[in-house]
């Protein structure tokens, strides 16, 4: 029996997908332990898995949750910068606390979320094999497509490739505080030093829960990337009240801002205004970010 460790952000969109993988791994006779920053979500214990804290005094649970609470009300570049600031502080915690904690539990392999940048370094430091899982949009740089944070369409033109390359370079500059921490840590240990963000992910297996057709046409997709489609457990679903009687047979438009930025009331209003006059019904999911009443009359 192997003992697989999971390192991922402590947010529903990442944890729930990893729970699906953990469930499938356990069904094959292996043990799974989650390593998280922040307060362990009830969903992990309910599913029968153990959680071990990675934060220590470097990034305490309360501070971690407060940072994500703030992220929920940010958008555009402000949201991206705050996300990367969280990532830098998380990198300090994972690199300082992670190796000893993971070693103590006796883990034999790691499954690391693509945005948990220092997770692969923990695996390399301990001599453990690891796989990378992309639970968001695929982050792998590719000058043939626009970066994930832009609103651009892909264009097969020289000017578009230059535009894309400049944007990816700008993103690399934002990654720099995290990358510098990882590079210094690995250099001190005598490990190979990554030159770019792509070097920190698994060179054996990278799983994306996107359907392949959802991704822009890439020219530089690593051979180890596998598109497997959505990762979910049937037992994840919780009953949510819904006014079924208000459906009138017209096509439905479903709008959600996910689990990280679902407190941007203005964005929901923009979506509602964009749907005005269409021969369709709009269903807005606010998740746990805000109550529907907070949006007022749309």
Per-region residue spans from a language model:
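Generic beta-sheet signal
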Residues: 35-37, 54-57, 113, 133-136, ...
């Amino acid at each position: 029996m192997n003992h697989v460790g999971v390192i991922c952000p402590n947010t529903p969109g990442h944890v729930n997908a990893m729970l699906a993988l953990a469930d499938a791994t356990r069904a094959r006779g292996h043990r799974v332990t989650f390593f998280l920053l922040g307060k362990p979500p009830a969903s992990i214990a309910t599913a029968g898995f153990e959680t071990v804290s990675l934060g220590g005094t470097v990034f305490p649970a309360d501070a971690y949750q407060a940072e994500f609470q703030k992220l929920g009300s940010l958008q555009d570049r402000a949201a991206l910068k705050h996300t990367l600031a969280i990532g830098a502080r998380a990198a300090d915690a994972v690199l300082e606390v992670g190796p000893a904690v993971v070693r103590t539990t006796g883990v034999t392999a790691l499954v690391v979320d693509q945005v948990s940048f220092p997770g692969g370094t923990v695996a390399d430091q301990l001599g453990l094999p690891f796989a990378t899982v992309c639970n968001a949009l695929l982050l792998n740089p590719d000058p043939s497509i626009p970066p994930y944070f832009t609103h651009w369409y892909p264009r097969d033109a020289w000017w578009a490739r230059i535009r894309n390359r400049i944007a990816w370079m700008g993103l690399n500059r934002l990654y720099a505080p995290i990358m510098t921490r990882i590079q210094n840590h690995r250099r001190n240990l005598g490990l190979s030093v990554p030159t770019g963000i792509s070097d920190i992910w698994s060179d054996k297996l990278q799983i994306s829960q996107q359907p392949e057709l959802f991704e822009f046409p890439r020219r530089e997709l690593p051979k180890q990337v596998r598109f497997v489609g959505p990762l979910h457990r049937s037992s994840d679903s919780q009953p949510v009240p819904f006014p079924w009687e208000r459906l009138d047979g017209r096509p439905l438009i479903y709008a959600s801002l996910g689990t990280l930025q679902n407190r941007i009331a203005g964005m929901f209003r923009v979506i509602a205004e964009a749907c005005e006059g269409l021969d369709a019904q709009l269903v807005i999911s606010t998740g746990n970010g805000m109550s529907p009443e907070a949006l007022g009359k749309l």
